């Protein structure tokens, strides 16, 4: 004999699944018939839209995710994928007009966070660019270095006030190093700003230097693309570079998925176990916290 609640735990009774009014098609797990499920949930009947695909090796994770992604593309979702491998490259070829496959090779990444695409420089853009420069610098300012962070933001403001076109990191670097005394006077910045440290570390991203491909302008236009795939296999062994590129990817995610709440957007991390192991070399924090922030905002 046992209690009724305990007995009901072992009582197998399943009702039939019901189709939603919109959504993607999956299989009914009992009868294997097509079933339409609304994973966006515009009415917010479920607290979170996030989900995970979990299976063993060869269990069909990539196949299911590709099928899911194709349906989302067909339904005019904006989809950003970060992957280790080339699972999504073929899908990009099926939709060449709206797709972009970004691979780190000799042609560069093609992400230019300094290109504001015609928008005004606001506080959000300044904060984002300050974070990018600090990553290049390998010097993330602490709470005790607020004056240095303020100085950097004023350099960024001065750059956009005096350079009207062709915005990129190389141009910003040259503006700071070539007009340093004038900027100090214009923006009332103390002379103890670490210019030598800035020019030495950030100089590694200029043409002919070690990380030139990170900032190389490839003319890539993200604005008209609704399906963007970032392939990180070639750089996963370089901890600094992989974290740096991930930070730049987050700027794209911000612009494509988080800036307009009216858009339906999905962020997919394929083989997330690889991503979760990344640690920000500047702060010592895991990438997982940044990923969680993005999913929280979608």
State where each predicted segment sits:
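Hydrophobic positions on the alpha1 helix immediately C-terminal to the Walker A/P-loop
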Residues: 64
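Walker A/P-loop NTP-binding motif
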Residues: 67-74
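Pre-Walker A adenine-sensing motif
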Residues: 31-45
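Hydrophobic anchor at the beta1->P-loop junction of P-loop NTPases
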Residues: 53
